[in-house]
Amino acid sequence: MEMLKFGKFAALALAMAVAVGCSSKGGDNAGEGAAVDPNAGYGANTGAVDGSLSEEAALRAITTFYFEYDSSDLKPEAMRALDVHAKDLKANGNRVVLEGNTDERGTREYNMALGERRAKAVQRYLVLQGVSPAQLELVSYGEERPVATGNDEQSWAQNRRVELRK
């Protein structure tokens, strides 16, 4: 019981730390060059999170899911947040858009296909959790919508993502 409480506290604290470090109120360049560790937290950029939120609410706030280089495999940490989103989608019937993105390496055509594979991986997981495919719209932007413009691993890692848009 003590370990469960500690685990929930640690998860919430980590989500809040990522949220505080990643939130931005900028204009068109918001997030450009931001220092986000895509392997931290639940593998997602959470935005602002209130300290009184439950673990489920913290997971619900996660809407960006990061991927390894040249991969469309979901990370286990991302699956936890997607479980909460699946529960919500089944309950309310809302539609969401899954936007697949890549870093700039590779050809435009390859990156469009990789972005689509990433969006499909999230879609497949949500459908396996009971979400209707009709609720999920997929789009791939490939390398066209970077959140970080640097030419380094940290920037590329921030761009290898799927964003869940409501």
Swiss-Prot record:
InterPro entries, per the entry: Bact_OuterMem_StrucFunc (IPR050330), OMP_bac (IPR006664), OmpA-like (IPR006665), OMPA-like_CS (IPR006690), OmpA-like_sf (IPR036737), Pal (IPR039001), Pal_lipo_C (IPR014169)
GO cellular component, one term: cell outer membrane
Membrane topology qualifier: Lipid-anchor
Family recorded in the similarity comment: Belongs to the Pal lipoprotein family.
Biological role: Part of the Tol-Pal system, which plays a role in outer membrane invagination during cell division and is important for maintaining outer membrane integrity.
GO biological process, one term: cell division
Signal peptide feature range: 1-21
The organism of origin for this protein: Pseudomonas putida (strain ATCC 47054 / DSM 6125 / CFBP 8728 / NCIMB 11950 / KT2440)
Lipid modification (S-diacylglycerol cysteine), residues: C22
Major localisation: membrane
Subunit structure, as described in the record: The Tol-Pal system is composed of five core proteins: the inner membrane proteins TolA, TolQ and TolR, the periplasmic protein TolB and the outer membrane protein Pal. They form a network linking the inner and outer membranes and the peptidoglycan layer.
Gene coding for it: pal
Ranges for domain OmpA-like: 54-166
Covalently attached lipid (N-palmitoyl cysteine), positions: C22
Keywords: Cell cycle, Cell division, Cell outer membrane, Lipoprotein, Membrane, Palmitate, Signal
Subcellular localization(s) per the UniProt record: Cell outer membrane
Matches recorded under Pfam families: OmpA
Protein name: Peptidoglycan-associated lipoprotein
Region (Disordered), start-end ranges: 147-166
